[in-house]
Amino acid sequence: MIRLSILLLFTLIACTPSPEPATHFYDWKKELNRLSSSPLSVKKTVILDGTTEIIDSVQIDLTKEWALFQEADLNKPAYALSYEDRSAPGIIHYVLKKGEDLPVRSFQIDLDSAGRPAVVEFVISSENLIYTTSKKLSMRLISGRVVSYTISGSQALRWFSTPTRYTVRGEALRAVTSR
């Protein structure tokens, strides 16, 4: 009987759902998933080393378009102690601590009066033996909806080349309704 009780106890413990992973920082990944869930039509401007191309897009895959914004999610176990919190009322701001070597250098979200993101800005950079890369990502929102975003940056071979510079700018035209 005792064995049965112990077995039943372990079975109940094993069936309880595991807790959500701890979030030490603003849950940007969750916010980005929410923003990506609504279809969006954008006018996109791409500038590559001074050459400009304008693309009117009927509807874009926001998950792919904003893949670089996913890099700014700080809620990874290895990042937990690597950032200094410089937040203030209405501003969420994290800066990489001195001596740390992680790609996200700065993470800032300005909130509107309802506590929703209004301006989002991230600085990401990395270097290895071959490349040096830097990116600045920004997004503007009104009432929780994206009105524009910009991804700009450069990449270069460390020793032998001038950097390739790029900018991708998207301006929301209107929300696309799904049928």
What are these regions (language model features)?
Residues I92-R179:
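Gly/Pro-enriched, hydrophobic low-complexity segments
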Residues M1-C15:
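Sec-dependent bacterial lipoprotein signal peptides
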Residues S36-P117:
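Surface-exposed acidic loop/strand-edge motifs in secreted or periplasmic proteins
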Residues C15-K29:
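Bacterial Sec signal peptide processing site at the extreme N-terminus
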